[in-house]
């Protein structure tokens, strides 16, 4: 968390504070891709080239075919669409080593810096 704290382009997608706690089965960040020279898809590709597999966080329900056919429209949910376009799920698992965590963090920070 401290590596992305107060970053101008990267934000934590989920803030845990007070009496709340998390199992941390996912680690999510939000990146303002409008401030970068590369798209989210290109960002994914660059991470993959560095052997970091990230994922699109959950696709909003109205974007699923079934709900689209029912008339749900993402234009009515601009915040959900923005969150979807900015949020990445990063590797997080029990045996993740500190060195691997550091590599993921440094790679993300470097990619953002190179593409501002």
Predicted regions and their residues:
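PLP-dependent aminotransferase class I/II
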Residues: 1-116
């Amino acid at each position: 968390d401290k590596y992305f704290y107060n970053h101008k382009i990267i934000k934590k997608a989920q803030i845990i504070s007070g009496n709340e706690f998390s199992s941390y089965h996912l680690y999510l960040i939000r990146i303002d891709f409008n401030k970068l020279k590369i798209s989210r898809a290109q960002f994914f590709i660059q991470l993959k080239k560095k052997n970091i597999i990230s994922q699109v966080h959950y696709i909003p329900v109205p974007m699923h075919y079934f709900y689209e056919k029912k008339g749900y429209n993402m234009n009515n949910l601009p915040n959900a669409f923005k969150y979807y376009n900015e949020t990445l799920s990063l590797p997080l698992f029990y045996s993740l080593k500190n060195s691997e965590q550091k590599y993921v963090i440094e790679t993300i920070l470097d990619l953002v810096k190179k593409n501002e």
